[in-house]
Amino acid sequence: MTPFVVEFLGTLLLVSGGVFGGPLLAVAALAIAIAFGGKVSGGHFNPAVTFFHYMKGDLSQTKTLWYLAAQYCAGLLVYFIYKL
């Protein structure tokens, strides 16, 4: 899988865990996401972490924008599922 798909799925797990299950499930979902996708994408799964790595110089501007787009799309998808 590409890093962007991994970021999308990891963020989807993290936000879904927080919205539908609470903090403990969110932490468990984050641990699962990092275990399965951390080596592919770096395991950011959070726009703040991605922005930090961009400011630190670890990510290019293009890669940062793609990561952020994947993370925001995952968050929006959880929002729309929640509103159903």
Segments (PLM) and residue ranges:
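Membrane-interface helix-loop junctions and terminal tails of multi-pass membrane proteins
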Residues: M1-L84
